[in-house]
Amino acid sequence: MSLPERPGGSPVYEHRNVYRNSPSRRPRPNDIETGFQSVPRAGHERGKSVSSYAETISNPHANTETLPLSPTHPTASPPPHSPDQPFTRKRSLIRPERNRIDKDHRNYHYHKHAANMETMPSSTGNDPILENVDVSTEPSGGSQTHGSFADSSPPRHHRSRKMSGDDQEKGNTRVKSRPRRSKSGKITKETRHRKSRKNPATAEQIRPPSAWNVYCAIVTFWCPDFMLKCCGKPTKAQRRAWREKMGLISIILVIMAIVGFLTFGFTATVCSAPPERLRVNKVTGGYMIFHGVAYDLSTSHHPPAEGIPLRQDGTGANVLFDLPEKHSGQDGSFLFQNVNGHCKGLINKAPGSDVPTNSDNELAWYFPCTTFNQDGSSRPNFTNPYYLGYACHTSANARNAFYVGLKGAADVYFTWDDIRNSSRNLVVYSGSVLDLNLLNWFNESEISVPDRFKVLRDQDSAVNKAIRGRDVTRMFQSPGDKQVAQCLEEITRVGFVDTETVGCIASKVVLYCALILILSVVGTRFVLALIFQWFISRKYAASKTSQSSDRRKRAKQIEDWSEDIYRAPARLPGDVGSSAMGSSDRTSKRGSSFLPTTSRFSAVYGSDRPTGARRLPTTMSSQGPASALLNPNSIYRQGNDSRASFLRPDPYSSAASPSDGPGPAGFIHDSVVPQPPSDWMPFGFPLAHTMCLVTAYSEGEEGIRTTLDSIAMTDYPNSHKAIVVICDGIIKGKGEAVSTPDVCLGMMKDHATPPDMVESFSYVAVASGSKRHNMAKVYCGFYDYGNKSRIPVEKQQRVPMMLIVKCGTPDEADKAKPGNRGKRDSQIILMSFLQKVMFDERMTELEYEMFNGLWKVTGISPDYYEIVLMVDADTKVFPDSLTHMVSAMVKDPEIMGLCGETKIANKRDSWVTAIQVFEYFISHHLAKSFESVFGGVTCLPGCFCMYRIKAPKGGQNYWVPILANPDVVEHYSENVVETLHEKNLYLLGEDRYLTTLMLRTFPKRKQVFVPQAVCKTTVPDKFMVLLSQRRRWINSTVHNLMELILVRDLCGTFCFSMQFVVFVELVGTLVLPAAIAFTFYVVITSIIHSPPQIIPLVLLALILGLPGLLILVTAHSWSYVVWMLIYLVSLPIWNFVLPTYAFWKFDDFSWGDTRKTAGDKVKKGGIEYQGEFDSSKITMKRWAEFEREKRARSAYFGSRENVVGAPGGWAVPPSHAQTDGYYSDA
């Protein structure tokens, strides 16, 4: 077997053996396509350094132009195929790992970064299979000065690798190209030219208007630009935002109209008011029934006849009330018989009959001309009161008066229960109810009837039993039977079956489907929220912390603690996990490391087969040697006193190493918190290094002190947490004596560099125009609790702290807010830094200082950090919250983000704070608990959340970036924000948009809510401040839900999916004002009119009552019942006032009254473009290049006397040749 070779040292893939391209060859584990690589064999190459930087092997193609990161560059795409080259393997539509990665792919930027990373040498003698990647590529296009040095570094053993398609994360993202950089680390003029072409003013002239802009122009055609200029919209961006706002409002109004139509208008439209109908046996008063129709005869007058005299007023008598025999409510069908129709030929005159006939042998009547009861209780009566044919109304005048002069008032209907009544002999034919007992009224001495009638009326016959109480329409379809049925319909119809129109049936179907859907969503959310609270959430929590293990007692302590923002917890962290030194072996959970866990026959990359023993979760510390985490002064260290031994390939070598000098390894702070062994588990799970990011803007000393105290006093070990504070500009809060950066700097001690010697460094900010260039200072040290601290001295813990102050360029030193670029820019500073560290990419001078500074005060490389906690500067964290959050992250590697519960500390300050208490409660314990079941929490609040920087993937030592993923960083750092949608995402709801971006990039990973993690904060106590805050939150919610609804890969399918839940939530948010108006309308109409609308009232009771039930079954404080009642009273504010104001302020991108500063003037953000970005002021190089130049500027590396706590000194400065290996290693 040949020696291992570097990928660039052998022919390209297409020139090698054709067998590797053959379909008959099965993929091997060491192929790049499979996502795995072999571990280099010992003895053929230099041993791997345990430093936190990648080994670099010299590049034989050092002069080859590197592949730029920018996907728009022509050399970024693979070279076209030439005829003299062998055909390469075609891409398949079936295998997902071979899908085309274009600009619309969710992992586009990640693939670009991964493609530019060098690979480790192969131990099999075969080169890794690389597709569409130049052989000689340099990651991030690093500069190659000092020709003898090779700066192309392969990824470390724990760096992210390009995985197979099945392992790649999925999601759809919008792509933004990265600028191309020159070899010197500067952004080229071509980039500036491309930037100028992206100027909104010129872009709008070239780019054709989109369908959305055309729609907005049509909606607002009535308001031309000159009118908007007169109304305070002078700039084009403001006018465009206003038109887009009106377009959105028009769509919201249409949705409200649709919901209103479905609620009230749909039934009235498709099921209009039917004609009046009267149920059988309910026809009374002035009605009389004829052939199934009730006629109103209460005001009728019958002409004089036998037995019907004139009244005293000379008018005819009323046949219902004036005669001795009352006929009100009776059936008079025999008085106006339907003869000689379909019955002609079936019913004939009997021999010797007195029934009159005409020349066509048509009979004058069939039945005796009398009335009968509508309930069918009358018996046949064949007597004639006065003369033959009395009351038969056979004259033309009489029949015209009835058939033409009278109009039916209502149909008489039978329900199917009435038809199945055993005392009646009823059947249904073509919707008409026929009474077969009326066939018994035939006087067979006068009339001859067919035998079929006799069989049908006989209740003892088999035929009658088969059809009685049923619909016989289908049974009487033959020609002979159809005539019989039609004849029966003419002479025996007593009413109609109870039916509804198709429209009424459709309206009921829609109503009940909507009811079932809403009840299902509401009920499912409630049940799944309970399941999460009772069962799922408990597996995320730490088994033990410094607080009480009794859940009820702990809940009571939290409620008492949250009553006041400055109230201390019931128990301060003590022995458990306070530091690496603070726990005894009895409280630690350590496993034995004496016996080996692998052998030479073990799989290199691990096995996916389940084992009998439960494997511990994977962390950075657990994958590497424990000694790699230790600093020179660690009590766990034995032997070598210099960290340089960890940077050398051979720790026992006697050769000098350049890292023994004053580099990052040379002046680690003497007070650094020692690192414990990797198997030390004080809480029952492996520890993971965590950054605690605190973003500050204009907060005062009291607010910041509260936050930092709570973070520093969490019971999570100080060896595994570091506080990172980023101040967004030199800003002084309203009523404060000093600026916020000065306040934060005063809370530090034991600085690695004296504060007065700290310089400002440049970086690329998230802004437009000249503000893209910003400068910041990096202060590193330890947290200082202060002389007046409420925390006892013996409880104060030593926590490393790094302060980043955005001070701005010298040009803006005299402006109101120098350095201010927004909270998103502060987050991007850290996220971009983490990306550069993980991929070993070129970084700015600021990031280089952050790297070294963090290493100084923590004693470990920044790429050991796996998790970042994000906290606002006015939030206080419960002591064991950080432990519970890290526990969830470590126990479930699929979790990429989580949040805890935020409680209100000023509940009783005013009615404004009182109405927010239950709203906060229900948003966490109902909404977020439900979403956590599916791992899709749609909003991780920026005041208290945690994200995973990178996650273990696949086999041993493989990690994929999560928060540090290039796709997340690229999209979150978008600085060209033009549309109303983008401005609401990036300028108002950046915290929520980060959550959306994570779900969109990694739809198969989880974002959950950890109820055991609790923080408290103060909420607005004035209505105008609340109005301004909720304006931002509601508008951000709408636009983020619009983004999430397009993500198809979320959990579930169709109506049983998170995508459908997001759709329902979006529609529910948009129609909130209409919904509360409809609710009041239903309640008022139900009180005034009768009968009440039962279904809407029941639905309303369920929606409003289930949250109260949630309080009871989850055993929360009974005080929340009172807060719920206050919330219900304030529903018009939550559902009408706040959403309506927010929708009307869609084009307002300012933060309003939420954050006040000294001399602040509220402006609408996101609409100014000031100056031009000069990229030449920003230098970007890899860490090794920065470090080389820094050391080259010194005549020698310095003496050990200059290093804090370092014994001994340098006798002779090391030669330049001795540093070559180190630089390539770094």
Curated annotation (Swiss-Prot):
Membrane topology, from the record: Multi-pass membrane protein
UniProt cross-references to InterPro entries, sorted A to Z: Chitin_synth, CHS4-like_dom, Nucleotide-diphossugar_trans
Transmembrane segment boundaries: 246-266, 516-536, 1060-1080, 1094-1114, 1118-1138
Bias type Basic and acidic residues, positions: 94-107, 163-172
Biased composition (Polar residues): 49-65, 134-151, 580-601, 618-643
Gene3D superfamilies: Spore Coat Polysaccharide Biosynthesis Protein SpsA, Chain A
GO annotation terms (biological process): ascospore wall assembly; chitin biosynthetic process; protein localization to bud neck
Keywords: Cell membrane, Glycoprotein, Glycosyltransferase, Membrane, Transferase, Transmembrane, Transmembrane helix
Protein name: Chitin synthase IV
Originating organism: Metarhizium acridum (strain CQMa 102)
